[in-house]
């Protein structure tokens, strides 16, 4: 007995000219950029239904691959500390949390601190906690982070929309205020 498979969807072309710096480009699929347009939603639902129907037989394999990758991923981890202007800077991740945490620790000589993943570090200063910044947002990406030469200000970039346009923020590391 064969099941009826959905037809392969084809996005209709709707030529939409756009002029930038005197050059006009016509994008026949620009209408798909609007996530609120019912036509976009309907098309994506059709794409998803088609893909699901064509790959349903792979569900077990998908789950096995996911579990293998997850099993090989060390969720609680940390980067190698880097010494800069009297501080050790490093990033760490924690199991069950999606985003990294950028930290620093006052340097006591040239020997890196003994930091163990998943263990609290005395004197650690959290510069940016991606998990806290992402809270309440559907999307989050942390861009660059850099500390001023005197170690008192942090410049970091965040993106909450996924459009790759980051907002530059500043944090006073003496007070913790943005």
Residue spans of the language-model regions?
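Beta-propeller folds
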Residues: 1-178
């Amino acid at each position: 007995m064969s099941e009826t498979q959905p037809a392969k969807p084809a996005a209709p072309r709707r030529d939409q000219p756009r002029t930038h710096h005197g050059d006009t480009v016509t994008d026949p699929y620009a209408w798909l950029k609007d996530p609120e347009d019912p036509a976009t939603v309907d098309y994506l639902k059709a794409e998803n239904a088609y893909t699901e129907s064509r790959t349903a037989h792979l569900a077990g394999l998908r789950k096995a691959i996911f579990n293998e990758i997850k099993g090989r991923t060390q969720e609680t981890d940390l980067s190698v500390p880097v010494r800069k202007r009297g501080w050790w800077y490093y990033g760490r991740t924690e199991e069950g949390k999606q985003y990294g945490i950028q930290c620093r620790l006052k340097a006591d000589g040239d020997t890196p601190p003994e930091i163990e993943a998943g263990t609290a570090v005395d004197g650690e200063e959290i510069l940016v906690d991606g998990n806290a910044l992402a809270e309440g947002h559907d999307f989050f990406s942390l861009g660059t982070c850099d500390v001023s030469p005197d170690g008192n200000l942090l410049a970091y970039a965040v993106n909450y929309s996924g459009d790759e346009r980051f907002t530059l923020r500043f944090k006073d590391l003496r007070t913790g205020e943005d």
